[in-house]
Amino acid sequence: MSDNRLNTVGSRKDFESFKKDGQAQAHQPGIDSKMEPFPIYEREGYKGSDKLKDKVAIITGGDSGIGKSVAIFFAHEGANSVIVYKDQNELEDAEATKERIEELGQACLLLQGDLGDSAFCQDVVKQTLETFGHLDVLVNNAAEQHPQESLLDISDDQLERTFRTNIFSMFYLTKAALPYLNEGASIINTTSITAYEGNDQLIDYASTKGAITSFTRSLAKNLAEKKIRVNGVAPGPIWTPLIPATFSAEKVATFGDSAEMKRAGQPAELAPAYVYLASDDSTYVSGQVMHVNGGTVVNG
């Protein structure tokens, strides 16, 4: 067991009693090794039942956070994964995720690059097919966020970058993957509670998440006749490296406290939603968004 897996397996009681301190990281999307404590990526006693046996999934942002937990749960269910991560700073986390997937008896391909580049997205699909021969599940999960006190503080560069990473990338990668997705395939997009509630300091980020929700619904309609399902997951406050890489230590210390359950969620509490949407358990579900947010009721 690698050091990065210490304290990353938990039960319901561990989720409820989880304590975190104020902390901050300098660069997004943040890395596991600098977090104290680590997020909980696996559920104690979880046993897969081959729901994704022999399937191949591309998971963006799969090196840490939500994407990492999704990749591990997919491996428990028999899937091989392609993990796409942004830069060299995330390599250690990506390798730890790959190690865990391989411990579970599945294969994992790591690819580093900028998902805001359409050519790179095409290469991701190309390398996936060269390695595994087919593609069954696409999880569009990678994102970035940069809080600002005012709309006037959002530079043109930040606006363009946030939209390119968060929503343009989904268009690019989905377009690249679509010719190779067959009947029964599943596309899962990570949106956010901010798409429904808004966020006064994440105006551009929340706007991209609203766009993702509309993208999900529209694409689901477009692909229904091809029997390819498209759904979304809207996380609430989830404890991932992106949080200390986004907010001040003071805000991180109280992150999640405003949720109805009075705590942040863990990636392991979110990943089973992706398993459901990727598997044949959800064959009559498309165009929907699952809200995993600690009890907040949203209309959408």
Label every model-predicted segment.
Residues 179, 221-225, 283:
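Alpha-helical segment proximal to the catalytic Tyr-Lys
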Residues 14, 19-20, 122, 143-160, ...:
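Conserved mid-core segment of classical short-chain dehydrogenase/reductases
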Residues 192:
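Residue(s) in the substrate-gating loop at a strand-loop-helix junction
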Residues 174, 208, 216:
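Active-site helix of classical SDR
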Residues 3-9, 35, 43-44, 148, ...:
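Short C-terminal tail/terminal secondary-structure segment
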Residues 136, 152-171, 188, 212, ...:
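Catalytic Tyr-X3-Lys loop
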Residues 91, 111-125, 156, 268-269:
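The beta1-alpha1 cofactor-binding region of Rossmann-like NAD(H)/NADP(H)-dependent oxidoreductases
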Residues 259-270:
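A conserved structural motif in NAD(P)-dependent oxidoreductases
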